[in-house]
């Protein structure tokens, strides 16, 4: 679906798709997370269920999944691609020194901070029409949500629910954004052998996250192009009908009604 905004269009998930994605995420947790922490993870998702379900993955229409439900949609894609990238690495004799649980847990929670803190959403709708129209800001950061980096807030939420993580999960979550996060440079640009990273989990997660973002960006672009093409065709049809005014009256086929019908189709109910 496409939703028109003051600044353009955006992809939109239906209520059914949002519910289905959330159910898939819970099933993924049930399948891959083990031990005592599974129940703690499930409690966190139950406590903030509505916020998890509705959270967008980003704020601007030209970013990835700037739509309600975009967060979970993105997380599911990163989980799927992480497992596929790991398989590709294995096929090429690359080092795999982590479990599937560590990989999936990290993929699920790498953007956890985008849900917000314990009381407030991270993103709220942008109510400034100028910024929506001219800057494509569908959402904006919630001023009630105390500043933390997305990654730091993820760790804060996990510790609040007493959810333990392994060292590899910590590194994986910390470095999923790669060099796009300034704080990651000290991990990724080490020139001393003893300081170099000792796992590959972060590289696989970063590749999966980047791939997911590119896919989501393409889906948004294709949706916009499709609606623009359809709109162009509707305008073309209206122009053709209006040009019939040059014809003799008896040659016209109720131009007023046809023009009105096409106008309504393009711009909606005028009432």
Per-region residue spans from a language model:
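Acidic/His-rich, divalent-metal-binding segments that scaffold phosphate/diphosphate chemistry
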Residues: 3-133
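Divalent metal-dependent catalytic cores for phosphoryl transfer on phosphate-bearing substrates
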Residues: 62-68, 73, 96-221
């Amino acid at each position: 679906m496409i939703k028109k905004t003051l600044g353009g269009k955006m992809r939109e998930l239906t209520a059914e798709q949002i519910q289905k994605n959330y159910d898939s995420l819970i099933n993924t947790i049930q399948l891959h997370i083990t031990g005592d922490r599974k129940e703690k993870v499930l409690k966190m998702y139950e406590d903030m269920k509505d916020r998890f379900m509705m959270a967008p993955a980003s704020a601007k229409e030209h970013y990835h999944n700037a739509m309600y439900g975009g967060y979970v949609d993105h997380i599911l894609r990163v989980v799927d691609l992480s497992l596929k990238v790991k398989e590709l690495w294995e096929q090429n004799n690359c080092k795999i020194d982590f479990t599937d649980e560590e990989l999936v847990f990290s993929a699920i929670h790498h953007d956890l901070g985008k849900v917000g803190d314990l009381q407030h959403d991270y993103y709220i709708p942008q109510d400034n029409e100028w910024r929506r129209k001219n800057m494509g800001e569908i959402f904006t950061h919630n001023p009630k949500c105390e500043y933390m980096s997305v990654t730091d807030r993820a760790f804060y939420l996990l510790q609040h629910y007493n959810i333990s993580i392994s060292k590899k999960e910590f590194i994986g979550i910390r470095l999923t954004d790669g060099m796009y996060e300034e704080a990651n440079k000290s991990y990724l640009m080490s020139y001393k052998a003893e300081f170099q990273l000792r796992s590959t989990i972060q590289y696989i997660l970063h590749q999966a996250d980047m791939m997911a973002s590119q896919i989501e960006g393409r889906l948004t672009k294709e949706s916009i192009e499709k609606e623009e093409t359809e709109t162009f065709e509707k305008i073309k049809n209206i122009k053709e009908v209006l040009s019939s005014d040059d014809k003799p009256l008896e040659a016209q086929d109720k131009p007023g009604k046809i023009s009105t019908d096409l106008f309504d189709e393009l711009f909606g109910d005028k009432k």
